Swiss-Prot record:
Residues 1-20 are annotated as: Disordered. The keyword GTP-binding does not apply. It catalyses: a phosphate monoester + H2O = an alcohol + phosphate. GO terms for biological process: nicotinamide nucleotide metabolic process. Its cofactor is Mg(2+); Zn(2+). It comes from the Eukaryota. This is Alkaline phosphatase. The chain crosses the membrane at residues 27-47.
């Protein structure tokens, strides 16, 4: 009787194994063993080769662009303005083709963020309280993407149109419990912090924070000479004017370019012989960083670019300066985009928040509103509101009325002013803040542009991308997700840097007005326009 373990059917060929079959089995075993050995050798060869030749990897480039204070309305206004100015119906801004999503901007302390908390969300990939510069809610410093990149062997750069110690650049390169501790921020930027120097290239304004208190143009509260420290201790090449910038060739890092005492000029007030534009600084920075990457076989670079004064124009409710700043930011974006398309990497552009509550359209009377706005008014303008307010304050009071009528109002796009406009400006003539408000309102009403605030708003802002980032960031996102992407993409550790910074100083004295007799507009933008 068959056992339960016996096969149901007879096995084919059952019986003694032939010699030829045994030989084939032996060859198969040897072949499999050989393949396994070869595979192991090949794996370890390539693994060790990869490790020993890490410098031959294709470098990674991350360009983070921040259009400070620019909201969706800014783009609508600028697009229509360019269409009118150049008779280009259907015109598209350079940014338009690269829209990938939108960002929510709240901070940990408010539904409406300030620039410091907004920038720290990008740099540390964490929410924090308004006013915090590279510092978390517990008032402990957090490692930034720029610092982590530098620690990992990348080159780093910052290009802005504000003081380099202002909230956004500071939040990537320094740590302060309050954004107005600009003495401390400048010290971090020249390498006096616990990590040493983290920034290889720094372009913008804000010279006053690097000069000792005894110096005429200083705004420091002490006598530290940070230019001397930067040059002698850290080897910075220092550029202080347009000539220095133009003569820059075969530049060696580190580079420190401080092209004004405070912020750089608005684009509409730009004097080419005095200081470079944002787009020029961006082009030079990219060239210098790329050349340095090729020469020292670094991993690549991280570059922060900020269109800082878009925000400041909106704080003033100045549609003239605002539209020209947005145009210049688009030129800078075009340069950065071309770089990434040629060399690879990731370009991210977004805003930290919207400023001003800008609306393209305004009800200017109690009657039912017209469905229009008038970009042609802005196209006639010659200067920013700050520039003209300063000019009024400094003008001979005996000839002020004709000056307002014949120069100031035509310079804001109103060639045929009415008596009320002239009167309102004249009444406000002694107070720079009142003048800015009056002038901004006159041109905004004339152009039918609306504003809801002189501060920030909670509106979501656009996110744009070029290169590999477009495969990872999509749709509506929290601002910290942008920082998280950069950390993963560059393969760096923010937490490791945070650990190194656990005893880093975050308290310092606020800056002070310098002794130099600057224009009222300089004082305004240096110490009051972006306090929100």
């Amino acid at each position: 009787m068959a056992s339960e373990r016996d096969p149901l059917l007879p096995v084919h060929g059952e019986g003694p194994e032939s010699p030829s079959r045994r030989n084939w089995k032996t060859w198969i075993k040897h072949g499999i063993l050989l393949i396994l050995v070869l595979s192991t050798v090949i794996f370890f060869y390539f693994f060790s080769s990869h490790k020993s030749k890490g410098t031959n990897e294709k470098p990674k480039f991350v360009i983070m662009m921040v259009s400070d204070g620019m909201g969706p309305g800014s783009l609508s206004m600028t697009r229509s303005f360019v269409e009118t100015l150049n008779d280009k119906e259907g015109y598209r801004l350079p940014l338009d083709e690269h829209l990938i999503g939108s960002s929510r901007t709240r901070s940990s302390s408010s539904l409406i963020t300030d620039s410091a908390a907004g920038a720290t969300a990008f740099s540390c990939a964490n929410k924090t309280y308004n006013g915090a510069v590279g510092v978390l809610d517990n008032e402990k410093p957090c490692g930034t993407i720029l610092e982590a990149a530098k620690e990992a062997g990348y080159l780093t750069g910052i290009v802005v149109t504000s003081r380099v110690t202002d909230a956004t650049p500071a939040s990537f390169s320094a740590h302060a419990a309050n954004r107005f501790m600009q003495d401390l921020i400048a010290e971090y930027q020249v390498g006096m912090g616990p990590l040493g120097r983290s920034v290889d290239l720094l372009f913008g304004g804000g010279l006053c924070s690097f000069l000792p208190k005894s110096t005429y143009r200083s705004c420091r509260s002490d006598n530290l000479d940070l230019l001397k420290y930067a040059r002698k201790k850290e080897g910075f090449q220092i550029l202080l004017n347009r000539t220095d910038f133009d003569e820059l060739s075969n530049a060696q890092l580190p580079l420190l370019g401080l092209f004004s005492d405070y912020h750089l000029s608005y684009d509409i007030d730009y004097q080419p012989e005095v200081q470079p534009k944002l787009s020029e600084m961006v082009e030079t920075a990219l060239d210098v960083l790329l050349n340095a990457t090729n020469e020292d076989t670094s991993k690549g670079f991280f570059l922060l670019i900020e269109g800082s004064r878009i925000d400041m124009a909106s704080h003033n409710n100045d549609p003239i300066a605002h539209v020209y700043e947005v145009m210049e930011y688009n030129r800078a974006f075009e340069i950065a985009s071309a770089f990434v398309e040629k060399n690879g990497g990731s370009l991210i552009s977004t805003s930290d928040h919207e400023t001003g509550g800008l609306t393209v359209g305004r009800q200017v009377s109690k009657k039912y509103p017209e469905y229009l706005w008038k970009p042609q008014v802005l196209s006639l303008a010659l200067h920013s509101i700050e520039y003209l307010a300063s000019a009024i304050v400094n003008h001979n009071q005996n000839t002020l009325l004709p000056y307002i009528e014949q120069f100031v109002l035509p310079a804001i796009g109103i060639p045929d002013p009415n008596p009320k406009q002239i009167h309102d400006i004249y009444v406000a003539r002694h107070n720079i803040f009142n003048l800015i408000n009056v002038l901004s309102d006159i041109v905004s009403v004339e152009a039918q542009i609306g504003w809801t605030t002189h501060g920030h708003t909670a509106v979501d802002v656009n996110v744009y991308g070029v290169g590999e980032v477009t495969e990872h960031l999509r749709g509506n996102m929290e601002n910290i997700e942008i920082g998280q992407f950069m950390e993963i993409y560059l393969n760096v550790s923010l937490s490791d840097v945070t650990e190194k910074l656990k005893d880093a100083p975050i308290h310092g004295a606020p800056d002070r007005p310098s002794l130099v007799e600057t224009s009222f507009s300089d004082r305004l933008v240096g110490f009051g326009a972006d306090l929100f």
